[in-house]
């Protein structure tokens, strides 16, 4: 998809080209109250990169393992002197790592051959991220990896309008659901119900309420959020982590045509709860759906930030909705395998590091983790950064 026109956030602190420091022998100061996390998305296991660190057609297992190695090295890296939260300090504790979905590429033909089964891709992700992230939170405990599904996990589980092999593989979506929502009775690939068992979970970390949800905030997810936020103080900042951008893609909604099924003619993917209301074509803008989300955010002003993947480049922007009644701080992140810029130029590979202080001020920094492919250990740099306030206020 093309880059949307979006109002840029007012940048309080920007660091372009500030080199990350080498590992320092000086121990970090005790962490202040707040929260710090890494956000990455669209790992796309099953695909290959055209080039990576001198290799050709490098698989996602190799690339993502290299990304995780840079996450593990973060605590001993210094923030740039960019005027943002904790500028110039050692990064120190990482409270969690968030993965924004599209972990396992669809099992369709890519580059003239079938993409590996989703269950194989999922095992590689678990090895690299779930078992491979070795950073600690501010309490000294291993930092968890929080996961939301993307459209590829859902298509692998329910089917797609193009041929896939196997036709369905529910393994990743079922395991995400079980690991993240911890149901009383774990689902299996036989008992998982894609309409009933949608991923929704929350975590309270450092005075911030994080909401992690299934693909996009459709009517079902908004109903879950309404119930959840009724138990959260309105003074508590809320951060949403999901896969799709706020201006959702029409094709992800339920087919409004005929039998409302997944078919090659209509090309709707039927992964959200709502039937598409803006026409009969996947090329139509999702104006009504976006308007419903805009109204929801306006009614819940404690929702202050939104992190997403899917469109695969680093961007900090304000989403205002079709009627421009809100200003939601929104953060789009790069993909290690399908980056809009980083696929052609591996030195632009990045993820995001978010730091929130006790006053609920947040700095989000782009971390360019492969700027010198010939010397990976030295080839890191801080990129763009933005600082925003998270304290709830009226959007109007």
Task: Give the predicted meaning of each segment.
Residues 1-11:
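Bacterial N-terminal signal peptides that target proteins for export
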Residues 42, 101-102, 150-151, 243, ...:
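Active-site glycine-centered loops adjacent to acidic/histidine catalytic or metal-binding residues
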Residues 10-20:
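Bacterial N-terminal signal peptides
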């Amino acid at each position: 998809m093309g880059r949307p026109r979006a109002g840029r956030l007012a940048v309080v602190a920007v660091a372009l080209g500030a080199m990350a420091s080498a590992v320092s022998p000086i121990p970090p100061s005790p962490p202040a109250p707040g929260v710090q996390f890494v956000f990455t998305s669209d790992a796309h296991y099953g695909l290959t990169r055209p080039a990576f660190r001198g290799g050709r057609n490098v698989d996602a297992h190799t690339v993502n393992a290299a990304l995780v190695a840079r996450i593990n090295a973060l605590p001993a890296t210094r923030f740039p002197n960019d005027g943002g939260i904790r500028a110039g300090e050692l990064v120190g504790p990482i409270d969690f790592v968030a993965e924004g979905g599209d972990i396992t590429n669809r099992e369709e033909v890519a580059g003239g051959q079938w993409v590996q089964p989703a269950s194989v891709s999922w095992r590689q992700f678990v090895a690299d991220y779930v078992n491979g992230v070795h950073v600690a939170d501010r309490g000294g405990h291993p930092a968890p990896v929080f996961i939301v599904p993307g459209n590829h996990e859902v298509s692998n589980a329910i089917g797609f309008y193009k041929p896939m092999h196997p036709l369905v593989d529910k393994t990743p979506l079922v395991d995400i659901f079980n690991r993240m929502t911890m149901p009383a009775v774990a689902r299996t690939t036989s008992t998982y119900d894609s309409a009933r068992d949608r991923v929704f979970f929350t975590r309270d970390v450092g005075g911030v309420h994080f909401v992690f949800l299934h693909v996009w905030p459709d009517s079902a997810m908004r109903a879950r959020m309404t119930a959840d936020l009724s138990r959260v103080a309105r003074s508590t900042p809320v951060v949403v982590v999901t896969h799709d951008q706020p201006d959702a893609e029409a094709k992800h909604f339920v087919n409004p045509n005929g039998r409302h099924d997944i078919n090659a003619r209509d090309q709707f993917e039927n992964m959200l709860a709502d039937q598409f209301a803006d026409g009969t074509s996947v090329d139509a803008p999702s104006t009504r759906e976006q308007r419903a989300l805009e109204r929801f955010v306006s009614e819940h002003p404690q929702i202050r930030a939104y992190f997403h993947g899917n469109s695969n480049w680093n961007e900090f922007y304000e989403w205002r909705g079709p009627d421009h009644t809100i200003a939601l701080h929104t953060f789009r992140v790069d993909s290690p395998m399908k980056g809009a810029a980083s696929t052609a130029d591996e030195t632009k590979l990045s993820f995001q590091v978010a730091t929130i202080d006790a006053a609920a001020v947040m700095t989000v920094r782009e971390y360019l983790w492969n700027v010198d492919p010939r010397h990976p250990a030295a080839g890191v740099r801080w990129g763009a950064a933005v600082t925003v306030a998270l304290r709830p206020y009226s959007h109007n």
